[in-house]
Amino acid sequence: LEPAYYHNTANTTAPVITVSGSGANAGFAQLYNENVFASDCSFADINTTPYVYFVYCLLKDKKTELDSLQKGAAQPHVYAKDINALATLIPPEEMLKLYTKYASPYFEKIGVLKEQIKKLNQSRDRLLPKLMNDEINI
């Protein structure tokens, strides 16, 4: 799922979790490994909690519950107050710290690989038309 639009200024600090607030994707949780401009969504970033990756996994695990929070027929909405009211068992602080210590490198690697994929796709999109039009040879 791609953002509907981009902004040249971020209002969050990576890593960032967004939960879509309205529309067909209301309740969809996404993790960004870059600063983003969060709009029409609920979000948590590294300034909100040091346990962003734990919260992200928790939200993904509670996807069915998030989907059930949608209100409204024509334009579904998921409100922050409803997300905050989800029943959740929070592990002790030491367990959260351990989870973050061991999980962070994996999530950071995922972020690096996503950025590489993005750059490779851009290269492909620039080079393929030139290759097809015989502007370059290999």
Where do the model's predicted regions map?
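Amphipathic alpha-helical coiled-coil/heptad-repeat segments
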Residues: 49-50, 61-76, 81-138
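A short beta-sheet element
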Residues: 1-63, 67-84
